[in-house]
Each structure stands twice: as structure tokens, then as C-alpha cells.
């Protein structure tokens, strides 16, 4: 049991004494436990990538922006029409006010 513990500690530290302990061990079972112990310590955690749905959502948002831009075009025409209406309305009341004064 102490030999197995010594092998695990030596394998973890990465010393050359692991080879010496493996030579002195009489049973091949402790060497098998060292090979099982080493991969258990090096566990790799995989990250989940979820960037693809976000890109699809951004593309959908861009399409919505284009539809909003198309809706703004008629509003600009209406504003231009309002400006013309205001200019004509200001000129018309001014003329009748000047005529009675003369």
C-alpha cells in the first residue's frame, strides 16, 4: 500500500524516482494504478460555444432596422408637405391684414 502511495506521489511530482519505484515493485498492479491516476488528474473541461444563435438574432435585428428605415421615408415626405403648408399659411393672413390698413 505504501508503494502504491509512493508511486502516485512520485507521478504527481514528476520525479525520476517514479521509475525507480516501478523497478522495485514486484507486482504489475501498482504500475497500472499509476497509469489510471495520471489521466484522472488531467481532466479537461470543454467550453460550450453559443455564439451562433446570437449572430442569427443580430441578423434579424438588422432586417427590422431596414423596415423601420422604409417607414421613415413617408414621414419625411409628410414633413416636407407640412413645411409648404406653413409657408403658404403665413403668407396668406399677412396680405389681408395689410389691405384693410391701407
Curated annotation (Swiss-Prot):
Q: Name one GO cellular component term.
A: periplasmic space
User: Which controlled-vocabulary keywords does the entry list?
Assistant: Periplasm, Signal
Give the span(s) annotated as Disordered.
Answer: 22-102
Q: Which residues are propeptide? A: 22-58
Q: Where in the cell is it found?
A: Periplasm
Compositional bias of kind Basic residues:
80-90
Q: Which organism is it from?
A: Escherichia coli O157:H7
Hey, what's the signal peptide range on this chain? 1-21
- Its protein name is Acid shock protein
Amino acid at each position: 500500500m505504501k508503494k502504491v502511495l509512493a508511486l502516485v506521489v512520485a507521478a504527481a511530482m514528476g520525479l525520476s524516482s517514479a521509475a525507480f519505484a516501478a523497478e522495485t515493485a514486484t507486482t504489475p498492479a501498482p504500475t497500472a494504478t499509476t497509469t489510471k491516476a495520471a489521466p484522472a488528474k488531467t481532466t479537461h473541461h470543454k467550453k460550450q460555444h453559443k455564439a451562433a444563435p446570437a449572430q442569427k438574432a443580430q441578423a434579424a435585428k438588422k432586417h427590422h432596422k431596414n423596415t423601420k428605415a422604409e417607414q421613415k421615408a413617408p414621414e419625411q415626405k409628410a414633413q416636407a408637405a407640412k413645411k409648404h403648408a406653413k409657408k403658404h399659411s403665413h403668407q396668406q393672413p399677412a396680405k389681408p391684414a395689410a389691405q384693410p390698413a391701407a
